[in-house]
Amino acid sequence: MYPEFEVVPAVDMQDGQVVQLVGGERGTEKTYGDPVEAAQRWVDAGARTLHLVDLDGAFEGERQNAAAIDAVLDAVGADVDVQLGGGIRTAEDAVSLLDRGLDRVILGTAAVETPEIVGEISDEHPGSVLVSLDAKDGEVVVSGWTEGTGLDPADAAGRYADLGAGGILFTDVDVEGQLDGVRTDPVRRLVDSVDIPVIASGGVATINDVLALRSAGAAAVVVGSALYEGQFTLDAAIDALGESSE
């Protein structure tokens, strides 16, 4: 998983279309067209991993965009790694997706409500579970970022690492989709708390934000709005990462 730092384009889906939300709030979405076309565009630009999110599933509690997800897997699943979150609530559902060809499942609400699910899935598909720790005001939130849990992200991360999680996906909800830049301190704190990869998400507006997250110790960064709004291109970010590591 993530042998070297990479930029992972987001393909967030709502009603079968690619959208981006501001601050995780329903009603703020901006639509960007067909998921397969978006996925293919990112693969052609050099993506090694795609980050799919079923937003309807995240809000409603069960996956709603199965047809679009299947279409993306059929189109590009053989070319890149694909990870999916949103509405995955049972081990059976997760395993069926992994058996279908998905590389990683992302668990948020399910992992908080039933932590042992992480171990159940990991026993059958080692390294395949990313636990999503989405933080608002320093607290892990679930159910489409609408419910607080009282959990501290760094404290929770250690527990999931012990249960066999392959990585932690950390979304800084307070800056998500706002194109105002990233906050590296929460990422550093998570990286220091676990020995598994931490994938950062939320707030990326420039290539310098990408480089800052790599310096903070993240294994990868998920980018959505900045790519869709043309703040920078994926191939330019990939080039900058290569140049800065030389």
Curated annotation (Swiss-Prot):
Localization: Cytoplasm
Catalytic activity annotation: 1-(5-phospho-beta-D-ribosyl)-5-[(5-phospho-beta-D-ribosylamino)methylideneamino]imidazole-4-carboxamide = 5-[(5-phospho-1-deoxy-D-ribulos-1-ylimino)methylamino]-1-(5-phospho-beta-D-ribosyl)imidazole-4-carboxamide
Coiled-coil region: none
Active site: 12 (proton acceptor), 134 (proton donor)
Enzyme Commission number: 5.3.1.16
GO process annotations (BP): L-histidine biosynthetic process; L-tryptophan biosynthetic process
Main enzyme class: isomerase
Family annotation (Pfam families): His_biosynth (PF00977)
Pathway(s) annotated for this protein in UniProt: Amino-acid biosynthesis; L-histidine biosynthesis; L-histidine from 5-phospho-alpha-D-ribose 1-diphosphate: step 4/9
Claim: Methyltransferase is one of the keywords in the record: no
GO cellular component, one term: cytoplasm
GO molecular function: 1-(5-phosphoribosyl)-5-[(5-phosphoribosylamino)methylideneamino]imidazole-4-carboxamide isomerase activity
InterPro entries (UniProt xref): Aldolase_TIM, His_biosynth, HisA_bact_arch, Isoase_HisA-like, Isoase_HisA-like_bact, RibuloseP-bd_barrel
Disulfide pattern: none
Presence of keyword Nucleus: no
UniProt cross-references to HAMAP family, sorted A to Z: HisA
Sequence similarity: Belongs to the HisA/HisF family.
Protein name: 1-(5-phosphoribosyl)-5-[(5-phosphoribosylamino)methylideneamino] imidazole-4-carboxamide isomerase
Organism, as annotated: Haloarcula marismortui (strain ATCC 43049 / DSM 3752 / JCM 8966 / VKM B-1809) (Halobacterium marismortui)
